Design a protein with these regions (language model features):
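Juxtamembrane inter-helical linkers in multi-pass membrane proteins
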Residues: 283-295
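Hydrophobic cores of alpha-helical transmembrane segments in multi-pass integral membrane proteins
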Residues: 2-100, 109-240, 247, 251-281, ...
């Protein structure tokens, strides 16, 4: 292999040599483990699943395998989260009354796991902030505190992932056949958002070695945690409720997660935009910035927006198909649909200006930041201030 290929990140080598041939024994063992897990899940819950849910189960297993092959740390993250959730299921023993047991009450019930997720996000932010200050003082790119911040971020994602899986099981314990995937209200989807954001940042931090950007990403995530806590207290949103008729569809299981991969990527890009503006400002003043260089930050921001745009596009298409099944038409110019289109056009334009026109620097950073407010209004603001077919998601 020539030097050009050696310099490429691992996943970019896919275009130069066979992806399958580069898989090792651990990769195939991971794939087998996921397949066995999916088979056990279908065996135990198959009587309660229709054909669409079985397709979603095996598609999810395939996605999990690809994630583990593409980003190696996922090979332990996914099995560990599933094992912790399965332990919680076993501790429940089919009866929600067992929630008072020590492990469930303080660690593994959905509420306990999610509270640990929230606590670890604040801990990660504190560690990243202290680590960034220490790195600036010692003029280094990494240190123990930044590593601790990364570890806390991993734990937060694992706790949130486990909490969502356990909450799914708890919904069946509480509601019987009316149990459902935990993406039915703002509380649940924000927990999903936090998990996705943590994992996405984890990937980019690992690939680009940019631990000092963690303070920007986790500042936004900590703000969202504050909102989740307020929302839980104000609306008792942590309580599991039956699905309203409009959400009783298998489309929800794929539309909502795809949407929140997009939201997570867009929000991360906005915080990277803030970091890039700080670097540009320091450069313009002739000062050395302690953050990664502007080009590196912009490259991560671009990749985040590209991934977010892809999944947001998929989610929008899935939403149109769901609308056809639910309301008889693919598009009705409902406020939520209109603002989804605004979000899509905003990031389509951003990508066009960067890839085709060749724009770089400050203007794209500002655009990404403004995009956060557009995305936030499309998700939360529309529900608060406008009415329409999607009003069931209101605050």
């Amino acid at each position: 292999m020539n030097n050009k290929h050696q310099a490429l990140p691992e996943h970019e080598l896919l275009t130069h040599k066979s992806f399958i041939r580069n898989l090792n024994l651990f990769d195939w063992a991971f794939a087998l483990l996921i397949a066995i897990g999916a088979f056990i899940a279908q065996t135990q819950a198959g009587l309660h699943m229709d054909i669409y849910e079985m397709v979603i189960l095996w598609a999810s297993a395939g996605i999990a395998v690809f994630l583990g092959w593409f980003f190696k740390p996922m090979r332990w993250f996914i099995p560990l989260g599933v094992c912790l959730a399965y332990l919680a299921v076993d501790l429940y023993g089919g009866d929600i009354k067992h929630a008072d047991g020590f492990l469930l009450k303080y660690l593994l019930s959905s509420q306990s796991a999610i509270m640990w997720q929230c606590a670890m996000i604040f801990a990660a932010l504190f560690a990243y902030a202290c680590g960034s200050l220490l790195a600036a003082h010692k003029k280094s790119q990494t240190n123990t505190l930044l590593g601790i911040g990364t570890a806390f971020g991993w734990i937060s994602a694992l706790a949130g992932f486990t909490g969502l899986l356990v909450r799914w099981h708890e919904s069946y314990l509480l509601l019987g056949d009316a149990g459902h995937i935990p993406v039915s209200n703002l509380y649940e989807v924000f927990i999903l958002f936090l998990v996705i954001s943590s994992l996405m940042y984890w990937y980019y931090e690992t690939r680009f070695t940019v631990q000092r950007l963690g303070v920007f990403v986790y500042t936004l995530m900590a703000g969202i945690v504050c909102f989740v806590l307020w929302y839980s207290l104000a609306r008792n949103a942590q309580q599991i409720q039956p699905l309203i008729p409009a959400l009783q569809s298998w489309w929800m299981k794929i539309h909502v997660p795809a949407n929140f991969i997009g939201y997570g990527a867009f929000c991360m890009a906005a915080m990277l935009g803030v970091a890039q503006l700080m670097v540009i400002r320091s450069t313009e003043k002739g000062k050395a910035s302690r953050l990664p260089d502007s080009a590196t930050i912009e490259e991560i921001m671009y990749k985040a927006i590209a991934v977010g745009f892809l999944f947001f596009t998929i989610a929008t298409i899935l939403g149109a198909l769901w609308a056809k099944a639910a309301w008889g038409g693919y598009w009705s110019w409902d406020p939520k649909e209109v603002w989804a289109l605004v979000v899509w056009l905003n990031y389509a334009t951003w990508l066009h200006l960067r890839l085709v026109v060749g724009w770089r620097g400050k203007i794209l950073a500002w655009w990404a930041i403004i995009g956060l407010f557009i995305t936030a209004f499309a998700f939360v603001g529309v529900n608060m201030f406008l009415s329409g077919l999607h009003s069931y998601g209101g605050l």
